[in-house]
Regions:
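Nucleotide/phosphate-binding catalytic cleft detector across ATP-hydrolyzing
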Residues: 1-35, 43-162, 170-224, 228
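Primarily the dimerization/phosphotransfer
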Residues: 38
Length: 232
């Protein structure tokens, strides 16, 4: 009588299951929000090599500065529209778990007499903390955002940033900077247009100006003029 075979003797050996590779930890996301006189815009992006990959974005015309020229104040309807838009931004930031962000407000909030109260309301209703930045900082941010577009052959650069309520012009001299380092020299411009490093050739701000005129303010002026002519 043949000996009894042990259980499982005819079973094929199961191949070892390959361990699933661990998912790479996502790179930290960055967000930038610009609350202007006419629009509220936000980008959420992750670093990719020497640039960024946009993960999410938001843009809406909130007309925050509508009526500001006459009253000097942000209107109730304008503030309500803006808070509604910022709630959407807050939801996107929460969805993507963004921890590194810069949220700024510009000309309309610089000029409005009730801007501080509005910024406090934004924080109270959305949890977002917006900083009202000075014209010089707005101009600096416009300049460094153009750095990747600068050709190594460029020696002088004029940056014009036309917004809803203000326009900034900045003249930069990078002729003394080695051609391959010119975009980086612009990126090194710090607050007050000062460079943080003195051991290498620097970008020089020859002159700059910020004027309280933009697309929205000019449109409002022309609308008022047309209404005056209609009433004649």
């Amino acid at each position: 009588m043949a000996p009894k075979r042990p259980n499982g003797a005819d079973a094929l050996e199961k191949p070892a299951q390959a361990t699933a590779p661990r998912a790479k930890r996502p790179a930290g996301l960055y967000a930038a929000l610009d609350l202007g006189t006419n629009s509220c815009r936000m980008l959420i992006a992750e670093p990719r090599g020497s640039g960024f990959h946009v993960v999410d974005s938001f843009s809406k015309s909130v007309q925050l500065g509508l009526g500001l020229e006459k009253s000097g104040r942000l209107s109730r309807s304008s503030m309500a529209r803006t808070v509604q838009a910022l709630r959407i931004c807050q939801q996107k930031l929460k969805k993507h778990k963004v921890r590194r962000m810069r949220l700024v407000a510009t000309e309309a909030c610089r000029r409005a007499i009730n801007a501080k109260e509005f910024i406090a309301r934004i924080h109270r209703e959305t949890g977002l903390r917006l900083d009202i930045i000075e014209p010089e900082e707005e101009a600096r941010l416009a300049v460094i955002s153009c750095a990747p577009l600068v050709s190594p052959k460029t020696e002088n650069l004029l940056v014009v940033d036309i917004g809803g309520g203000s326009t900034e012009l900045v003249w930069i001299d990078i002729g003394g900077v080695p051609p391959t380092d010119r975009p980086h020299a612009i990126m090194r411009l710090h607050a007050g247009f000062k460079t943080g490093q003195r051991d290498r050739p620097q970008a020089q701000v020859v002159d700059w100006i910020s004027v309280p005129l933009g697309v929205a303010t000019r449109s409002e002026e022309h609308t008022s003029e047309l209404q005056s002519l209609t009433n004649l």
